[in-house]
Amino acid sequence: MSHILRAAVLAAVLLPFPALADQAGKSPAGVRYHGGDEIILQGFHWNVVREAPNDWYNILRQQASTIAADGFSAIWMPVPWRDFSSWTDGGKSGGGEGYFWHDFNKNGRYGSDAQLRQAAGALGGAGVKVLYDVVPNHMNRGYPDKEINLPAGQGFWRNDCADPGNYPNDCDDGDRFIGGESDLNTGHPQIYGMFRDELANLRSGYGAGGFRFDFVRGYAPERVDSWMSDSADSSFCVGELWKGPSEYPSWDWRNTASWQQIIKDWSDRAKCPVFDFALKERMQNGSVADWKHGLNGNPDPRWREVAVTFVDNHDTGYSPGQNGGQHHWALQDGLIRQAYAYILTSPGTPVVYWSHMYDWGYGDFIRQLIQVRRTAGVRADSAISFHSGYSGLVATVSGSQQTLVVALNSDLANPGQVASGSFSEAVNASNGQVRVWRSGSGDGGGNDGGEGGLVNVNFRCDNGVTQMGDSVYAVGNVSQLGNWSPASAVRLTDTSSYPTWKGSIALPDGQNVEWKCLIRNEADATLVRQWQSGGNNQVQAAAGASTSGSF
């Protein structure tokens, strides 16, 4: 596919940007956001099974190093379970995408079981967490010759109980999927255990670093928390709660609540981040200035940190190929750059849609924004302030390394109008409709030239042979290298010459630094597999300097 070759070439010529430590752990409120430093790529679009039938896993394997080099720390994979469904309606047709699966066999329309394992291994080896899409609410119960057979009348299905309407009944604690005939009773011990065991299998056998839970309006959020606790408690998770206030019955408190309140309540109960449909609704129905009303713009950091922001996905947006995909709630083209500039410079965990990144020409722009986010140290819970008195949206975002001033569709003349200190321009696109400035006189990664500024130093660790779920990190005697703490070490993400691992890390200019290579588990920082033996590596930080170690 030509776009893959082009992406690889672009990644090779772009300058490397500072890597940040891959933080593990839950939020202060116990939410599984894996440290709050993820940038996620949605690794498919709706028509993948028609555009690249039985070959998508191979494509992901081939592009693993490019995905890592582009700055993504995780990839949202398609549903891995077998789906041979098909449908036609008014001249349109589809099926096989995974959302009407019939068993847990991995030989499906994205590729084979072996190809999936190879793709997961390549992605994990490149330092990209694999997050599987999972669909516990419903399955294709009528498909013949499936490996999961659940008879009617034993409480396995929603319609085994009286079903008075589209709300919980005695065999289902959520909404129906379409008419409800295919809805599973996830509260039944056998059904609960079936999914618990499969999530554990995906983690142990297929490199899962987390899960995206589909259609969570169909089952209790507490069930998601239990599944994660029982099978993958230290992993990342996110729920898709696409249900506005007016869709709840009049007697439900959520009928008069805000989008933010509804999705935050789900996150509180599931202990997982949640897709920021509060922001998506404002993107669709409000002005750019209204984007501040997303969950990621909430004044409370406990709200911001659970927001998983996105512009479009396989459901809401267009896809290459047949019928343009689903496009149920697609953002207008004229706002796509502004939207990515916002989610990639603001709090929350951003998700980039595959087709925006690799099919439709936004890739260079998105790479630039990822570099800005990483260099500034913007995280899920970073502070954000909005400034009135200007057109469009104007915000100040406080990263751990730099402050960003963001102006979208705005008449703001310069960052000094809303923030003190010196700033340099980082992004200016769409005829000035997208502008981002960062504090300091340079990029924080090698172009400052001033005493005490940060400069990019090239790190290399040789002979870093790892198992699935582990990566090579640099750790050392400065805060940028974790002060010798493995939990705060910096993951090296360039594995194009595996088992050599490389990365560019921002260090204080002129600082004498001592450091070592180590191998540790990505999800559990306490699982250190190997330290580099011998004396410490040494380097004096200077722009473009190189340093290496070896196992």
From Swiss-Prot:
Name by which UniProt lists this protein: Glucan 1,4-alpha-maltotetraohydrolase
Cofactor section: Ca(2+)
Recorded superkingdom: Bacteria
Catalysis: reaction(s): Hydrolysis of (1->4)-alpha-D-glucosidic linkages in amylaceous polysaccharides, to remove successive maltotetraose residues from the non-reducing chain ends
Protein family: Belongs to the glycosyl hydrolase 13 family.
CDD domains: AmyAc_arch_bac_plant_AmyA (cd11314), CBM20_alpha_MTH (cd05810)
Keyword terms: Calcium, Carbohydrate metabolism, Disulfide bond, Glycosidase, Hydrolase, Metal-binding, Secreted, Signal
Active-site residues, Swiss-Prot/TrEMBL: D214, E240
Cofactor note: Binds 2 calcium ions per subunit.
Residue ranges constituting the CBM20 domain according to the UniProt record: 449-551
Disulfide bond found in the keyword field: yes
The species this protein was found in: Roseateles saccharophilus
Positions of the record's site feature: Transition state stabilizer: D315
SMART domains documented for this protein: Aamy, CBM_2
UniProt cross-references to InterPro entries, sorted A to Z: Alpha_amylase, AMT4_domain_C, Carb-bd-like_fold, CBM20, Glyco_hydro_13_cat_dom, Glyco_hydro_b, Glycoside_hydrolase_SF, Ig-like_fold
Signal peptide: 1-21
EC number: 3.2.1.60
Gene Ontology biological process: starch catabolic process
List of residues binding Ca(2+) 1: D22, Q23, H34, D37, E38
Binding of substrate, residues: Y99, F100, H138, F177, I178, G179, G180, E181, R212, H314, Q326
Pathway in which this enzyme or protein is active: Glycan degradation; starch degradation
Residues binding Ca(2+) 2, per UniProt: N137, D172, D175, D183, G218
Keyword Transferase (UniProt): no
Protein location: Secreted
SS bond list: C161-C171, C237-C272
